[in-house]
């Protein structure tokens, strides 16, 4: 019988959310260097791939380790156009061909990430505004080299005004963690302290996100990712959308409990690797 694979949590401590390291230590072997990885290990490379993902995944492969998501999954999650196309009508329409935009908007613009701290750096009312904003974003050193994408603006149910003047306001949006085809945790995307309590109380609970909607989204992207997040939101007309897909090795916890996320990941890893 082959020995069970050792799950290794390769991490950068300063980049982890509160409580994350203690939660990971309950289930995984902790490591801060790729030199600690042994042949046969299953590696959860948390916040470790940037800025040279190909180098990291190549090195770990040469060490004889298997990396959750791998380079293919890492690249897929970073490619908004790829996963948007796979999701189809489950996600807002997205394009990098600004000449094809209808004049009437509005649109949301983003590179690999959106500047949610400055709504004026995300929102464009018309196609002309989108073209001008793209030029500004391309000149921004923080987005230089990113593919700037325009997305159909979806007005989500509000959870209150922006806690910071000029920032993106909180809305009914949830971060759903998925590990190997199973939802292991779901919670508010926005910090609850930034939201109005009455609106949070009136909003759907995470377990009220339609199961069929989540299953459809997971079927679209789950062949490319093993451990990932779906940010899903409810619009003002009552329709659910996938707003974002993120690599679970990079996504923040939002309001999810790391203990729940990593217990779920450990359970699913044990299932797929045969570890008892």
Stretch-by-stretch model annotation:
Residues 1-31:
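Short, charged N-terminal beta->alpha structural module
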Residues 48, 112, 153-154, 177, ...:
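Anionic group-transfer/hydrolysis microenvironments
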Residues 185-242, 261-275:
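A long amphipathic alpha-helix within ATP-dependent nucleotide-binding catalytic cores
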Residues 2-9, 39-43, 65-66:
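Hydrophobic beta-strand segments of well-ordered beta-sheets in folded domains
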Residues 161-166, 172-189, 241-246:
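Beta-strand scaffold of nucleotide-dependent catalytic cores
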Residues 42-44, 110, 238-254:
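A short beta-strand motif that forms the metal-chelation/ATP-contact edge
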Residues 169, 224-226, 246-249:
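Donor nucleotide-activated moiety binding/catalytic core segment of transferases
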């Amino acid at each position: 019988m082959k020995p069970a694979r050792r799950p290794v949590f390769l991490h950068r401590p300063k980049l982890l959310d509160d409580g994350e390291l203690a939660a990971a230590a309950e289930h995984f072997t902790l490591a801060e260097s790729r030199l600690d990885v042994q042949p046969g290990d299953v590696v959860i490379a948390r916040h470790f791939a940037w800025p040279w993902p190909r180098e990291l995944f190549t090195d770990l492969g040469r060490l004889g380790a298997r990396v959750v998501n791998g380079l293919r999954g890492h690249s897929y999650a970073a490619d908004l156009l790829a996963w948007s196309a796979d999701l189809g009508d489950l996600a807002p329409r997205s394009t990098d061909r600004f000449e094809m935009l209808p004049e009437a908007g509005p649109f949301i613009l983003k590179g690999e990430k959106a500047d949610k701290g400055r709504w004026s750096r995300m929102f464009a009312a018309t196609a002309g505004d989108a073209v001008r904003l793209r030029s500004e974003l391309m000149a921004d050193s923080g987005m230089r080299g990113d593919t700037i994408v325009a997305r159909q603006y979806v007005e989500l149910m509000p959870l209150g005004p922006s806690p910071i003047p000029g920032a993106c306001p909180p809305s009914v949006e949830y971060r759903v963690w998925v590990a190997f085809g199973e939802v292991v945790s779901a919670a508010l995307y926005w910090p609850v302290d930034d939201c109005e309590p009455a609106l949070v109380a009136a909003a759907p609970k995470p377990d009220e996100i339609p199961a069929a909607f989540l299953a459809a989204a997971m079927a679209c992207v789950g062949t490319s990712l093993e451990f990932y997040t779906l940010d899903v939101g409810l619009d003002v007309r009552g329709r659910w959308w996938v707003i974002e897909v993120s690599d679970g090795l990079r996504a923040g916890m939002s309001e999810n409990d790391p203990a729940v996320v990593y217990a779920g990941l450990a359970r699913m890893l044990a299932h797929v690797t045969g570890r008892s």
